[in-house]
């Protein structure tokens, strides 16, 4: 209700929080690692397009530009619902998107992810569900082939988001073997 009834209060909070992040980003810019993943865990239901466009896009543009000027490669973690945000993912100057989760776990197809990302790097991309013994192995292998076909060489193939506790580690090994054979 605050966003509708008192947007000036929200704007003040966002500005104050952004300023509070200055010290963190100074440290990130000076650290020796060339890679920074913004681990925000973005979900379109928590950050729908109006919030994304008004508050998050300006913030990320500023911070990603700051990191890039320091020589960093920047990615953001988007593993929740993402379909409503697809048209806006390229509004920020990050290098890639991490943990995009296609169907059947997520709400988008691999092709929709590719269209939205364009030349951005995809990190991960394999639904974690495919590592469960209850899912057909052919679903996993088909997904891996399609990801490599659409995204390679702009792909860091991995599990979106983590292997489940009861996931089959042999499927992880299989993905590694497949990746070597596909590229």
Residue ranges and their predicted role:
Residues 1-183:
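Active-site loop segments of alpha/beta catalytic cores
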């Amino acid at each position: 209700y605050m966003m509708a009834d008192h947007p000036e209060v929200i704007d003040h909070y966002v500005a104050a929080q952004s300023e509070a992040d200055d010290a963190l980003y100074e440290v990130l810019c000076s650290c020796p690692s060339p890679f920074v993943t913004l681990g925000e865990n973005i979900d379109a239901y928590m950050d729908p397009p109006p919030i994304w466009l008004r508050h998050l896009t300006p913030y990320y543009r500023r911070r990603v530009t700051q990191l890039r000027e320091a020589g960093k490669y920047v990615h953001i973690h988007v593993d929740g619902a993402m379909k409503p945000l697809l048209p806006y993912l390229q509004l920020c100057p990050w290098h890639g998107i991490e943990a995009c989760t296609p169907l059947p776990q997520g709400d988008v197809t691999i092709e929709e992810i590719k269209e939205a990302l364009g030349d951005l790097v995809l990190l991960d991309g394999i639904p974690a569900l495919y590592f469960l013994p209850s899912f057909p192995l052919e679903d996993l292998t088909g997904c891996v082939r399609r990801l490599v076909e659409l995204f390679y060489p702009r792909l860091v193939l991995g599990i979106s988001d983590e292997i489940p506790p009861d996931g089959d580690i042999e499927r992880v090994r299989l993905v590694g073997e497949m990746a070597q054979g596909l590229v």
